[in-house]
From Swiss-Prot:
The keyword Transmembrane helix applies. Binds 2 heme b groups non-covalently. Belongs to the cytochrome b family. Its cofactor is heme b. Keywords: Electron transport, Heme, Iron, Membrane, Metal-binding, Mitochondrion, Mitochondrion inner membrane, Respiratory chain, Transmembrane, Transmembrane helix, Transport, Ubiquinone. A ubiquinone binds at residue 201. Heme 1 (or BL or b562) is low-potential and absorbs at about 562 nm, and heme 2 (or BH or b566) is high-potential and absorbs at about 566 nm. It is found in: Mitochondrion inner membrane. InterPro entries: Cyt_b/b6_C, Cyt_b/b6_C_sf, Cyt_b/b6_N, Cytb/b6-like_sf, Cytochrome_b, Cytochrome_b_C_euk/bac, Cytochrome_b_N_euk/bac, Di-haem_cyt_TM. GO terms for molecular function: metal ion binding; ubiquinol-cytochrome-c reductase activity. Heme b b566 binds at residues 97, 196. This is Cytochrome b. It comes from Microtus abbreviatus (Insular vole).
Length: 380
C-alpha cells in the first residue's frame, strides 16, 4: 500500500496533500475550517445536482417546481433545506476562516490569500444567483435591486444592466442565465480551491504563534485527519439541527410568496450573510459611491499584507491590535444587524458610523496599533 501511495502518479498527489503533508505541531481548531469548507462545497454540489434534476428555470414554473420538490419528490424537502441552509453553514465557515487568517497574519502568504479573496467573491456571486432561483418575492426584488446597482457605472452602466437582464427588466431570460451560472460556478470554485491549496502547500501552514515551524512538523495523517473529523462531526450535528428543526429561521417569509413585479415588499434585503455589505452599500447616499464601498468592503482584504506594520505576524502577543480586531468583529455584527433594518432614524446614522469604523479600523487603527507595539518592544 505504501508503494502505491508514494509511487502512483495520481495517488501520490493526494498523499502529499492529505497524508504525508508536513504540518505544524501546534495548529488549533481554527485551522479546521478549510476542511469544513471543502465538506460544505461537496454537500452544496451534491444537493444542488439533485435539485437541478427537478427544478425548471422558467418564470411560469420555477416557484411551483420548488414547491413540487418539497411536496412530491422523495426527501425533496430535505435536499432543498440542506441546500438552502448549507449555504448559511458555508458562509459561517468562510467568515471564521477569513477571521482566522486576519487574526493570525495568514494574509502574509500573498498568493494563497489573494486566491482566497477571489474564492470569496465567487462564492458570494454563486449564493446571490442561487437566491434568485426559487422566484419568490425576495428573489425577484433582490435580483432587481442588486443587478440595478451596475447602472451606476458611468457611460456603460444602463447597457450593461440590460445585457445582464436579457431585456428591460428581470424576467425569464435573467432567471435562465442565473440558473446556468449558478450551476457552473461551483465547479469553477472547486478548481480555484485546488489552486488555493497548491499555493498553500508551497509555503506550508501558518500556526497560532506566527513563528516559523519548519523545525517542528508532524504528518497530517493521522493527527489532523482525526482532528478534522471531529470538526466535521460538530458541523454536521449543527447543520442537521438547523435543517431539521429550524429550516426557515434564516430565510425570508416573503420568499414564500411568488414573484410579483407589481408589488414591492416593504423591506428588500438579501440573505443574512450579505447584510454587512448591504449596510455599507446603503450608508452612502450616492449610488456609485455605495457600489464602490460595497466592493471595497471585501476587496480591502487584499490590502492587508500592505497594511501590516508589526514585526510580529500573528496577533497572539499583540494586545492593542487584538482589541482593535475584536472591535472590528463587533462592528461587523452591528453592520449585519443594520442591514436587516429599515432605512430610517436611528438606523441610518448607526449604519454610517459602523461603515466608517469598519474602514478606519482596518486602514488606520490596526496599522497604527502595530507601530505602537513595535515601539513598546524596542523600549524593552
Amino acid at each position: 500500500m505504501t508503494i502505491i501511495r508514494k509511487k502512483h502518479p495520481l495517488i501520490k498527489i493526494i498523499n502529499h496533500s492529505f497524508i504525508d503533508l508536513p504540518a505544524p505541531s501546534n495548529i488549533s481548531s481554527w485551522w479546521n475550517f478549510g476542511s469544513l469548507l471543502g465538506l460544505c462545497l461537496v454537500t452544496q454540489i451534491l444537493t444542488g445536482l439533485f435539485l437541478a434534476m427537478h427544478y425548471t428555470s422558467d418564470t411560469a414554473t420555477a416557484f411551483s417546481s420548488v414547491a413540487h420538490i418539497c411536496r412530491d419528490v422523495n426527501y425533496g424537502w430535505l435536499i432543498r433545506y440542506m441546500h438552502a441552509n448549507g449555504a448559511s453553514m458555508f458562509f459561517i465557515c468562510l467568515f471564521l476562516h477569513v477571521g482566522r487568517g486576519v487574526y493570525y497574519g495568514s494574509y502574509n502568504m500573498i498568493e494563497t490569500w489573494n486566491m482566497g479573496i477571489i474564492l470569496l467573491f465567487a462564492v458570494m456571486a454563486t449564493a446571490f444567483m442561487g437566491y434568485v432561483l426559487p422566484w419568490g418575492q425576495m428573489s425577484f426584488w433582490g435580483a432587481t435591486v442588486i443587478t440595478n446597482l451596475l447602472s451606476a457605472i458611468p457611460y456603460i452602466g444602463t447597457t450593461l444592466v440590460e445585457w445582464i437582464w436579457g431585456g428591460f427588466s428581470v424576467d425569464k431570460a435573467t432567471l435562465t442565465r442565473f440558473f446556468a451560472f449558478h450551476f457552473i460556478l461551483p465547479f469553477i470554485i472547486t478548481a480555484l480551491v485546488l489552486v488555493h491549496l497548491l499555493f498553500l502547500h508551497e509555503t506550508g501552514s501558518n500556526n497560532p504563534t506566527g513563528l516559523n515551524s519548519d523545525s517542528d512538523k508532524i504528518p497530517f495523517h493521522p493527527y489532523y485527519t482525526i482532528k478534522d473529523f471531529l470538526g466535521v462531526l460538530i458541523l454536521l450535528m449543527a447543520f442537521m439541527i438547523l435543517t431539521l428543526f429550524f429550516p426557515d429561521i434564516l430565510g425570508d417569509p416573503d420568499n414564500y410568496t411568488p414573484a410579483n413585479p407589481l408589488n414591492t415588499p416593504p423591506h428588500i434585503k438579501p440573505e443574512w450573510y450579505f447584510l454587512f455589505a448591504y449596510a455599507i452599500l446603503r450608508s452612502i447616499p450616492n449610488k456609485l459611491g455605495g457600489v464602490l464601498a460595497l466592493i471595497l468592503s471585501i476587496l480591502i482584504l487584499a490590502l492587508m499584507p500592505l497594511l501590516h506594520t508589526s514585526k510580529q505576524r500573528a496577533l497572539t502577543f499583540r494586545p492593542i491590535t487584538q482589541t482593535m480586531y475584536w472591535v472590528l468583529v463587533a462592528d461587523l455584527l452591528i453592520l449585519t444587524w443594520i442591514g436587516g433594518q429599515p432605512v430610517e432614524y436611528p438606523f441610518i446614522i448607526i449604519g454610517q458610523t459602523a461603515s466608517i469604523a469598519y474602514f478606519a479600523i482596518i486602514v488606520i487603527l490596526m496599522p497604527i496599533a502595530g507601530m505602537i507595539e513595535n515601539n513598546i518592544l524596542d523600549l524593552d
